[in-house]
Amino acid sequence: MKHHSLIFLTGFSGSGKSTIGPLLANSLGYGFIDLDQEIESKAGKSITKIFAEEGEQTFRNLELETLRQLTGKKELVVSLGGGVLENNDCYRLIRENGTLVYLKSSPRSLARRLCNKTDRPLLKGEHGTRLSREEIELKISTILEKREPRYATADLSVQTDIKRIGSTVEELTRTIIRFVRQAEQARLKQQSDNNREKQ
């Protein structure tokens, strides 16, 4: 389908962005880009290395620059990094240029999905020690509470806790198509109303 162009997927690490994103893009006939992978490709190193060698500010600058380039594209699903909405400039770009979709999961589900991963800084304590599932869940709850005000502004929100990935993608595809059609109808109506006022 050819319609309204740029879809940003947000949500906590483990919410299903990198799994659902390509499937959703395929279902819509769009391209797919993972923002973090795009940044790593540009920098020629992993995000962990960027943070360690050049600091967070360098990473945030790369994040914003990469996002700016993507906002000029159409028919694209973009999976966002977990904290990208906390960057005010990135947040503004996203809200002005596309549809924001929040993939929502409970701290318990997220902790269960993430506890076997070994490469996530989130899973480590102050001195690099591995956290228990309960500690991870508590840490996730704290971060989610901080991010929730931005997540709450998403155009669409989909629960990814217990559903099969396939049914989530189907539901999301239908919802996005409906949302885009309604947005286009509202835009055309506004345009028509404006034209009438000018006459």
UniProtKB/Swiss-Prot annotation:
Keyword Nucleus on entry: no
Cofactor notes: Binds 1 Mg(2+) ion per subunit.
Gene Ontology terms describing biological process: amino acid biosynthetic process; aromatic amino acid family biosynthetic process; chorismate biosynthetic process
Residues the record lists as binding ATP: 14-19, 120
Cofactor: Mg(2+)
Residue ranges crossing the lipid bilayer per the database entry: none
Binding site for substrate: 36, 60, 82, 147
Cell location: Cytoplasm
Primary site of residence: cytoplasm
Catalyses which reaction(s): shikimate + ATP = 3-phosphoshikimate + ADP + H(+)
Binding site for Mg(2+): 18
Recorded metabolic or biological pathway in which this protein acts: Metabolic intermediate biosynthesis; chorismate biosynthesis; chorismate from D-erythrose 4-phosphate and phosphoenolpyruvate: step 5/7
Subunit note: Monomer.
Membership in a protein family: Belongs to the shikimate kinase family.
Stated name of the protein: Shikimate kinase
Species of provenance: Chlorobium limicola (strain DSM 245 / NBRC 103803 / 6330)
